[in-house]
């Protein structure tokens, strides 16, 4: 229901609607009648909104080396005309860095560098795709790379929802000094308890997402099936990829091999 049932705030004065606010992940839609701005969050952002806007310049695609030698691809965007160095915002995604990157241009226009990275094994990044497994070390290494670039002032924030929110908590786990802020939305707590397994039981609801993540690029069409009841009856679960997709899915097998909260998680 995420596309149709966002919460809304309505503000009335003398029985008349004067403002309406609908928050949606990292953005919000606000409509307000002229003259009533002081009753809304706009009053808090008045000075910020008056600051100059910059153009968006793509510095390039960079392949960042991780501690084990694997390189992860990231696109870097800089505020055109802004005095460097500037603080940076980092987004780590399994859904292809070049898909929807324009969403983050509003931050570039406000004077931030933005770095959008494919996590390990996804899209243009090297290495093995194993959900959740590498995000702590990779996140820490990425923060260090971003924070030490000549265009960055050493301060890095992170943002994003769902898996993009999970990568933030992982990146924060080792206490990287460059990480100064996080906006983590609709995300999980731990990989074991809130991800593939819930209370020790493998979550059947996660198979649709797993199917969409079997290729190097996100393939949401693989979730759109009419035979999910039959698929979820397949036993053993390790065979679900071969029988439902006609191919083995190694990361599903690896997760199923660890039904307890051991060092894998």
Functional labels for PLM-detected ranges:
Residues 121-131:
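Glycine-rich "HGGG/HGxG" loop immediately N-terminal to the catalytic nucleophile
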């Amino acid at each position: 229901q995420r596309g149709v049932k966002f919460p809304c705030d309505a503000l009335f004065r003398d029985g008349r609607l004067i403002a309406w606010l609908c928050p949606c992940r990292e953005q919000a839609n606000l409509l307000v009648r002229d003259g009533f701005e002081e009753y809304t969050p706009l009053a808090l952002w008045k000075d910020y909104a008056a600051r100059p806007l910059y153009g968006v310049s793509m510095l390039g695609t960079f392949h960042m080396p991780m501690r084990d030698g694997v390189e992860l691809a990231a696109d870097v965007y800089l505020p055109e005309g802004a005095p460097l160095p500037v603080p940076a915002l980092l987004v780590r995604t399994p859904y292809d860095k070049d898909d929807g990157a324009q969403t983050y241009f509003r931050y570039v226009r406000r004077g931030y560098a933005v770095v959008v990275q494919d996590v390990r094994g996804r899209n243009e990044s090297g290495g093995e795709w194993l959900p959740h497994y590498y995000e702590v070390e990779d996140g820490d290494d990425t923060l260090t790379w971003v924070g030490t670039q000549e265009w960055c002032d050493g301060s890095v924030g992170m943002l994003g929802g769902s898996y993009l929110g999970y990568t933030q908590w992982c990146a924060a786990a080792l206490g990287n000094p460059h990480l100064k802020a996080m906006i983590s939305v609709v995300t999980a707590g731990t990989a074991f308890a809130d991800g593939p397994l819930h209370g020790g039981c493998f979550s059947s609801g996660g198979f649709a997402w797993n199917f969409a993540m079997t290729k190097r690029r996100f393939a949401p069409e693989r979730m759109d099936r009419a035979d999910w009841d039959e698929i979820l009856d397949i036993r053993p679960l390790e065979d679900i990829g071969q029988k439902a997709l006609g191919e083995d899915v190694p990361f599903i097998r690896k997760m199923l091999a660890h039904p307890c909260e051991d060092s894998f998680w």
